[in-house]
């Protein structure tokens, strides 16, 4: 007990404890924002691949390699302010607090003060509607259009008609499942759009919502995203699709063309979307049978007349060329025979056939004898050079009086006549065949229950009425 009484708090036994006090003092001076040894981004990315030096452009502040000495960040966590309006109040059409109404009224005042923005919004809406109408029409691929351009009749039919309907895809086992999933997704989108539209009507009134509904697209999207973030996270994903094709043998071929999911080209080729039936065909059911038959036979007659005229002109040119070649060959043959007779006369006149001939005419007599004894048929058989020369002379004699400009005008006139006549007659035939200018392909009927048909029709009707939140 006496030893315990001699003890005190300020005991002199401090051997081995000085470094503990220093460590405790150093720990008390630590903070989250205290600078440590800076590391290079290569080491950080190598040893901590799950936590890169610059994770994303939205988090560039987390730069561990370039921290400044004079920056000291606060340790407190930033908490977003929570909106007072709950999810139930927004979707149960209950009155919302006054601060949201004040902001919306301020937006209305700004829109009323800027009429130019209204015109821009109306133009954008009209453009969106036109784009949607064009997307609803089944359009062919470039190759099909190029094939149609080569035929003026098909081009006229394409200009006079538009093909509507959905391309019938090959039957698959998962077709019913895909239809049910698509109907469910469309139903959810339609219900969500209707709820947001009712919310606008309840907050602004029917007359204001009908007038400024299109101007509140951004506000509606913000409120929708804000309400959605309360019960589910909002994610943005970028998908890159790599399409790989394989032929019938299973060999992979990598093509740069876009995949034809709807098989539009095959559909157009099989159904002959730009072809009109013959008027005498049993499959021909025109809207106006008399006008369709008249235009069809008129086109056939004009094409026959044009073909006969063109081929008769070409045939007459070929016949005239053959006659000219034959006459030229005969003339050349007569010239060779005449030269041989002249050589024979000179040879006999100068007595080259006698044994004591004249010494001064020895060389000339040899030339006359060679010319007299030659075979003219052998020289006449080599007619390729003569034919080419004659053909060039005929072309020059044909072009020189007419000139190149005249020939070009004649050629362009013939091409214009053939193209324009077939294009116009194809256009008129399509109008007389289809009447309204719309060609439809009905889909093969699939067995469906009446309840599913009713729900699908109600969803489509409500989808046409609701035009909000086009994402």
From Swiss-Prot:
Main location: nucleus
Listed Basic and acidic residues bias regions: 115-126
Alphabetical list of InterPro entries matching this protein: Brl1/Brr6 (IPR040202), Brl1/Brr6_dom (IPR018767)
Superkingdom field: Eukaryota
Keyword Transmembrane helix: yes
GO biological process entries: lipid homeostasis; mRNA transport; nuclear envelope organization; protein transport
Membrane topology, record value: Multi-pass membrane protein
Acidic residues biased stretches: 70-92
Biased composition (Polar residues): 172-185
SMART domains listed in its UniProt record: Brr6_like_C_C
Ranges per topology, Perinuclear space: 321-407
GO cellular component entries: endoplasmic reticulum; membrane; nuclear envelope; nuclear membrane
Family named by the database record: Belongs to the BRL1/BRR6 family.
Function: Involved in mRNA and protein export from nucleus.
Protein name: Nucleus export protein BRL1
Gene (UniProt): BRL1
